[in-house]
Swiss-Prot record:
Sequence position, cross-link Glycyl lysine isopeptide (Lys-Gly) (interchain with G-Cter in SUMO2): K40, K203, K228, K254, K282, K443
Cellular-component GO terms for this entry: nucleus
Any matching Pfam family: zf-C2H2
UniProt xrefs under InterPro entries: KRAB, KRAB_dom_sf, SCAN_dom, SCAN_sf, Znf_C2H2_sf, Znf_C2H2_type
Record keywords, A-Z: DNA-binding, Isopeptide bond, Metal-binding, Nucleus, Phosphoprotein, Repeat, Transcription, Transcription regulation, Ubl conjugation, Zinc, Zinc-finger
Protein name, as recorded: Zinc finger protein 394
CDD domains registered for this protein in UniProt: KRAB_A-box, SCAN
A single GO molecular function term of this UniProt record: RNA polymerase II cis-regulatory region sequence-specific DNA binding
Subcellular location(s) of the protein: Nucleus
Span list, region Disordered: 43-62, 238-283
Gene source species: Pan paniscus (Pygmy chimpanzee)
Length: 561
């Protein structure tokens, strides 16, 4: 009996395959106590798959992309998928080189880049930040650049560049630092002068005059850039080289009125002796400043934009590796007057002013931002996620809930600066302020009534009898769009206004207000004849007829006498 059970178990194990056998091998010791023989799994049974990667390991970013983008359909089975994921993760995080803190920093950095808005993600990823601090610096610089477009009328690429000190440059992989230098030399068709290259490698500060002499013996370079271009700058990533190839436009470097601009000097700050003005002990302060110790390694004009031999700069410029920044300012001009030095930023600005790429599939209305489209779609779906805790009323937008809550709190945050009257909503304040601006009032030619320009066309409909808003259900017409919306609730049966006391619901807010007076006992309408008060205006009108009838009766009796 036992032998037959053992044979059956062995047969089922053979059907399950070596994967299950390997998992059971972990429990080999308990199995021996139970009298079961351990089964050794041959390595060949796991398959002969090996990672199909080249001998030279790819860079961590490539491995990360392969790790995130791997699909189960691309591999032969679960074993291969798991093995490949482990290998890609190891090549990405490099546990044999990085500490636990560094690995955690990489994971946090990846998640930080993931949650960034799409328009920022591309910029930050192009700079390949090595830490979260570098990524934050890029985001802040880009935000400052975008915020400053209206005041400065110019966006410069340095606002979006990652600052690399000599220490950070040394921490870069040799392949990456060499690639940055080789890319710069390849794009410019030039090489570093030997005298300067050795001193740059040794982190020595080169006198300004020597830089100018090495780069331009005739001294025309200083004349061409007097007061216009920076001499010391940040070492930017190779993103600029790629952008120049794509757009053909140089990216000007200019960083002003920002923390990164400390120690950022231009040729206009260079005196005749070739030193920086404001430095007490020649270059001692520069040596102590990590920000100022970064000489520009690569900033070049695209080949199409370089001056010819006959131009002022001369042919020597093409063969020299400049330690100064040279850029031709060719801003993109927008209709609003803002200038942009990069086509991507110009495209973003153009979308904000013109394009509405997000379109509603129900009504065809377009929006500039995706969030506005989501907010609009709640009109069609009827979703009202924001509810008032006082009365239970729900709203589709948080701003509408905020306005509604002021009816409970009595808050009136909007104040008229001329008369001091306060209002709950900004629209009410704007309507009130029109009473102070008499110049915007117009007189109706039909009846002589004076009204604001915003209400003039609405008032003229009273005389013309125009009713442009028509109900498709019953073909009833209305003068105002709001009246049509209120009327629609009769057909849909919608009653959005509910009483917080008794739960009764109404299709109009005015009806709810009248109903609530039953619970509060409020009687706002007062008869001027006898002082009696009423909850509704219709009740007051009915009551006033009593006094009118008494007057008429008294008049008839006097005439008879």
């Amino acid at each position: 009996m036992n032998s037959s059970l053992t044979a059956q178990r062995r047969g089922s194990d053979a059907e399950l395959g070596p994967w299950v056998m390997a998992a059971r091998s972990k429990d080999a010791a308990p199995s021996q106590r139970d009298g079961l023989l351990p089964v050794k799994v041959e390595e060949d049974s796991l398959g002969s798959w090996e990672p199909s990667y080249p001998a030279a390991s790819p860079d961590p970013e490539t491995s990360r992309l392969h790790f995130r983008q791997l699909r189960y359909q691309e591999v032969a089975g679960p074993e291969e998928a798991l093995s490949r994921l482990r290998e890609l993760c190891r090549r990405w995080l490099r546990p044999e080189l990085l500490s636990k803190e560094q690995i955690l920093e990489l994971l946090v950095l990846e998640q930080f880049l993931t949650i960034l808005p799409e328009e920022l993600q591309a910029w930050v990823r192009e700079h390949c930040p090595e830490s979260g601090e570098e990524a934050v610096a890029v985001v802040r610089a880009l935000q400052r650049a975008l915020d400053g477009t209206s005041s400065q009328g110019m966006v410069t690429f340095e606002d979006m560049a990652v600052s690399l000190t000599w220490e950070e440059w040394e921490r870069l992989d040799p392949a990456r630092s060499d690639f940055c230098r080789e890319s710069a030399q390849k794009d410019s068709g030039s090489t570093v002068p030997p005298s300067l290259e050795s001193r740059v490698e040794n982190k020595e500060l080169i006198p300004v005059q020597q830089i100018l002499e090495e780069a331009e013996p005739q001294g025309r370079l200083q004349e061409a850039f007097q007061g216009k271009r920076p001499l010391f700058s940040k070492c930017v990533s190779t993103h600029e080289d790629r952008v120049e190839k794509q757009s053909g436009d140089p990216l000007p470097l200019k960083l002003e009125n920002s923390p990164e601009a400390e120690g950022f000097n231009s040729i206009s700050d260079v005196n005749k002796n070739g030193s920086i003005e404001g430095e007490d002990s020649k270059n001692n302060e520069l040596q102590n400043s990590a920000r100022c110790s970064n000489l520009v390694l690569c900033q070049h004009i695209p080949k199409a934009e370089r001056p010819t031999d006959s131009e002022e700069h001369g042919n020597k410029c093409k063969q020299s590796f400049h330690m100064v920044t040279w850029h031709v300012l060719k801003p993109h001009k927008s209709d609003s007057g803002d200038s942009f030095h990069h086509s991507s930023l110009f495209e973003t600005q153009r979308q904000l002013h013109e394009e509405r790429p997000y379109k509603c599939g129900n009504c065809g209305k377009s929006f500039k931002q995706r969030s506005d489209l989501f907010r609009h779609q709640r009109i069609h779906t009827g979703e009202k996620p924001y509810g008032c805790q006082e009365c239970g009323k729900s709203f589709s937008q948080s701003a509408a809930l905020t306005k509604h809550q002021r009816t409970h709190t009595g808050e009136k945050p909007y104040t008229c600066l001329k008369c001091g009257e306060r209002f709950r909503q900004n629209s009410h304040l704007n309507r009130h302020q029109s009473t102070h601006s008499r110049d915007k009032h117009f007189k109706c030619e039909e009846c002589g009534e004076t009204c604001h320009i915003s209400n003039l066309f609405r008032h003229q409909r009273l005389h013309k009898g125009e009713r442009p808003y028509k109900c498709e259900e019953c073909e009833k017409s209305f003068k105002q769009r709001s009246d049509l919306f209120k009327h629609h609730r009769i057909h849909t049966g919608e009653k959005p206004y509910g009483c917080s006391v008794c739960g009764k619901r109404f299709n109009q807010s005015a009806t709810l207000i009248k109903h609530q007076r039953i619970h509060t006992g409020e009687k706002p309408y007062k008869c001027l004849e006898c002082g009696e008060r009423f909850r509704q205006s219709t009740h007051l009108i009915r009551h006033q007829r009593i006094h009118q009838n008494k007057v008429l009766s008294a008049g008839r009796g006097g005439s008879r006498l």
